[in-house]
Amino acid sequence: MFLKIFHTDDDSIKKAVLSDTCCLIKPMEINFESEKIDLSNLKIDKPSSHSNLDPVIFDFIRIKRMIEFCEENNLTHIGYIDADVIVTDYEKLSDMITDCEYYDFIGISEIPLSRNGNVQKSYSWKNPNNLFVASLKFLREVRTRQLELLNSEQSEILPWASFGADLFNKILNEDKFNTVLKNYKMIIVNNYLKGSKDPLKFSISNIKSLISKYTDNPIIAFNVGFSNMGKLYE
């Protein structure tokens, strides 16, 4: 398994890993067939509150679960991007855009928190640097690059589709929506959108169901927020 990670906080990343052989440096490449990062000793058990924990720890939980998901679904080439990188160091991601056809799966962390655990003031739908909007822009460029590589004339196809979790099951269970989904090459599942009474309605079985409806290996991207970490990968 191949994993490439882009992150903004090298020092915290290194401190969060328990073994010298597990240090992650941005950007990094690890072949998990020869050496697998062991995150099993992280002493966090589905915390109900994250206000006093370093957000980098949660990045490792996301990465661990992302790897498990990809292993279950035979996705072997993975990219993981800290959303802050997209906002602050966007140029560093140019090679991932260039090589987007190489990835089976791209995960994006959603971190609307400052280091003291408070919601960032910049986390606003009206803010041009909104992490979610920046993530969509990045994925749109990935999709644009895919179309270029395929020399496709299907420019009218939207480069990404975004669904709130509370609509996800409905979409999967209606044929007309499934037909529409097949026109997309990239799916983003947002499970942290405000206003949803139950942002955890979808499960790993729903994701598997969606994947099975495709024949052309779409990229499926998750904005994996703090609220769902104990449930998204159950």
Q: How would you label these PLM feature ranges?
A:
Residues 24-31, 77-82, 105-108, 179-183, ...:
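A structural signal for short, well-ordered beta-strand segments and their strand-loop junctions
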